[in-house]
């Protein structure tokens, strides 16, 4: 028996057929961090980065990326998302991004939440690279998912 969901018995890639699955409310939460120098963090916090507001465009980029996940990730289903939220928190040496994606559908939204975080953090890098080319994007991960056959899952703290 083949346990790989995206590979058929002949080894050919395929998109999983989710047509027979029940529609349920699904939520995924992802998180990641971008580390930077204190001066860079201060400039972003005060809105004085060379490109202006950094977090506004990063939030929009994350939302847009979640909506395009099916175009970016091979064999990922294109989804009609009900909601995507992208939030930022200043931490000691950087910015933490948390994205929540949700829908009522037949497949999960983990990849959409992860893509939102990834692109939001990449946008912060792009908007602030004139100040700090050594920024580090790290620890992008799924922290929670709810819904579907497997129910609720939470990452260990």
UniProtKB/Swiss-Prot annotation:
Q: List the catalytic activities from the record.
A: (8S)-3',8-cyclo-7,8-dihydroguanosine 5'-triphosphate = cyclic pyranopterin phosphate + diphosphate
Which superkingdom, per the lineage? Answer: Bacteria
User: What is this protein called in UniProt?
Assistant: Cyclic pyranopterin monophosphate synthase
**Group of enzyme by EC:** lyase
Q: Listed GO molecular functions? A: cyclic pyranopterin monophosphate synthase activity
Q: Does the keyword Lyase apply?
A: yes
| Organism of this sequence | Novosphingobium aromaticivorans (strain ATCC 700278 / DSM 12444 / CCUG 56034 / CIP 105152 / NBRC 16084 / F199)
Quaternary form?
Homohexamer; trimer of dimers.
């Amino acid at each position: 028996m083949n346990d790989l969901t995206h590979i058929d018995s002949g080894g050919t890639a395929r998109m999983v057929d989710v047509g027979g699955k029940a529609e349920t409310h699904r939520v995924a939460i992802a998180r990641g961090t971008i580390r930077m120098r204190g001066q860079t963090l201060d400039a972003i916090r005060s809105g004085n980065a060379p490109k202006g507001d950094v977090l506004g465009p990063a939030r929009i980029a994350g939302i847009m990326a979640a909506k395009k996940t099916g175009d970016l990730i091979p064999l990922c289903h294109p989804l009609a998302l009900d909601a995507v939220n992208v939030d930022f928190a200043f931490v000691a040496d950087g910015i933490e991004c948390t994205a929540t994606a949700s829908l009522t559908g037949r497949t999960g939204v983990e990849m959409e939440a992860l893509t939102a975080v990834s692109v939001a953090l990449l946008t912060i890098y792009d908007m602030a690279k004139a100040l700090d080319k050594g920024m580090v994007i790290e620890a992008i991960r799924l922290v929670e998912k709810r819904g579907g056959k497997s129910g609720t899952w939470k990452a260990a703290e």
